[in-house]
């Protein structure tokens, strides 16, 4: 599996720079990905809250310049991790807001959080710190996520939530202008 995952990652990285970017409404992408997880959430008695804050432009969205299917991949991977580490009945929160030049997407869960002293390690290639009962993982998923975010001229950071158990991942992407 590791060789297959690594091979696919290299192909994806090579094709990323050739894919066409376009104006994308990030709210629509998030809603689409959350819809894809709906049955899993029902089966596990978990829920996702989507919170849209700040001013939304006149076209009713937060727009960025990007590759739609790659941004879906980013959101799906981050949600999949949050769902995996959350217990039944826990809530995952996606918050979408803005700064003067960027769109900020924050995903928070109520799982155990990061055991690493430096949570940024999770974005390193081949790094995995999942418990054995989670099955085998290649440690490539979050590295791919980071590469996609950086291709979009964005940043991604991970931290533990303050004063509450859980993880927080923030993705900052430039607004479409």
Enumerate the predicted regions with their spans:
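Short beta-strand/loop element within the Bergerat-fold HATPase_c
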Residues: 89-101
């Amino acid at each position: 599996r590791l060789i297959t995952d690594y091979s696919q990652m290299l192909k994806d990285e090579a094709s990323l720079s050739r894919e066409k970017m376009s104006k994308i409404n990030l709210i629509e992408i998030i809603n689409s990905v959350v819809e894809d997880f709906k049955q899993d959430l029902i089966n596990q008695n978990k829920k996702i809250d989507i919170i849209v804050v700040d001013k939304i432009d006149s076209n009713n969205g937060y727009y960025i310049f990007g590759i739609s299917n790659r941004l879906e991949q980013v959101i799906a991977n981050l949600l999949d991790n949050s769902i995996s580490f959350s217990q039944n009945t826990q809530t995952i929160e996606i918050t979408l807001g803005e700064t003067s030049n960027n769109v900020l997407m924050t995903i928070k869960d109520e799982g155990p959080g990061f055991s690493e002293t430096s949570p940024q390690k999770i974005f390193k290639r081949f790094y995995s710190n999942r418990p054995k009962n989670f099955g085998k993982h290649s440690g490539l998923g979050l590295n791919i996520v980071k590469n996609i975010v950086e291709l979009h001229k964005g940043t991604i950071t991970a931290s533990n939530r303050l004063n509450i158990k859980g993880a927080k991942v923030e993705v900052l992407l430039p607004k479409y202008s």
